[in-house]
Amino acid sequence: MATVVRLTRMGRNKRPFYRIVVTDSRKRRDSGWIESIGYYNPMVEPEVVKVDADRLAYWKSVGAKLSDRVARITK
């Protein structure tokens, strides 16, 4: 199974926030995920990013790839 760390959209119309989740790369954006490791809220100033660094490091160590957006916001 190819795993990827990516964002899944939550919230309501025109007020999105995102969960940072680990999922199978073949699944759709908002379908089931393996584990939720944080969240990202771009609608507040400043943007809020909270990530469980230990779990992110674990998933990277077992071969999970980061999506472009997750790689950018977790720097």
UniProtKB/Swiss-Prot annotation:
HAMAP family the UniProt entry points to: Ribosomal_bS16
GO CC list: cytoplasm; small ribosomal subunit
Molecular function in Gene Ontology: structural constituent of ribosome
GO biological process: one example: translation
Keywords: Ribonucleoprotein, Ribosomal protein
Stored InterPro entries: Ribosomal_bS16, Ribosomal_bS16_CS, Ribosomal_bS16_dom_sf
Matching Gene3D superfamilies: 3.30.1320.10
Family statement: Belongs to the bacterial ribosomal protein bS16 family.
Keyword field contains Ribonucleoprotein: yes
Pfam families referenced in this protein's UniProt entry, alphabetically: Ribosomal_S16
Organism: Campylobacter fetus subsp. fetus (strain 82-40)
Name recorded for this polypeptide: Small ribosomal subunit protein bS16
